[in-house]
Amino acid sequence: LTTRRQRQMCIRDRINTEQPHSFFIPYDKAGDSLTQTLNGTWDFKLYKIDDDIPKEFYKKSYDKSDWDKIPVPSNWQFHTEDFPVYTNIIYPYEINPPFMPSDYNPVALYKRNFNLNKDWENMEVFIHFGAVNSAFYVWVNEKFVGYSEGSKTPAEFNLTDFLTDGNNEIVLKVIRWSDGTYLEDQDFWRLSGIERDVFLYAQPKLAVRDYFLKN
């Protein structure tokens, strides 16, 4: 599912994501949350179309010397030559679902490194994306983790089996317009990127994953 044609021929809107659940922050004890922010400065490279992206961009050895830097969270239209689009009922591209424009549909690569909290040994480690617009793929340490679309909803992945002691590398491939964009034709600015908080959190193997109130 990492190419434009593969996405268009598939009806899945997520791969390996956690089930949606009520949002809460786990704590080991008062004042000691089991979280680690990944907000901040990421390595960044923007391409005009998916087909322009090199095949091995997710490898640790990939040369990033010509990449830029971008703050996360943010929208890349405020940091690049790509442009924001404002419209209401008019789509900003030719209507041909589930297909998207082949001549201009920017795709961005994001990379950063982080050290895993040593106190999280023998715990399950998840990553939380508050919102990524409009669809994205995730790799950790050169291994494919998953895919999600839905530009204003959180997405979470279990990273436990992908992480190593010490330094880890995470890579995102973010697509400006996806087939899910057809369902988001409201009156608002069309912007792209990792636009809400990103953080890791840890939980014991036996833990509360969701809760609800019944009246």
What name fits each language-model region?
Residues 1-11:
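Single conserved hydrophobic/aromatic residue that forms the stacking wall/gate
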Residues 15-18, 24-31, 83-85, 186, ...:
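N-terminal, polar/Ser/Thr-rich
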Residues 28, 43-47, 53, 77-81, ...:
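Accessory beta-strand-rich segments of carbohydrate-active enzymes
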Residues 29-46, 69:
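Mature N-terminal segment immediately following signal peptide/propeptide cleavage
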Residues 37, 61-63, 110, 117:
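Soluble non-transmembrane domains of integral membrane proteins
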Residues 53-72:
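Short Gly/aromatic-enriched secondary-structure transition segments
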Residues 90-98:
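Surface-exposed acidic, glycine/proline-enriched linker/cap segments
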Residues 213-215:
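Short beta-strand segments of immunoglobulin-like
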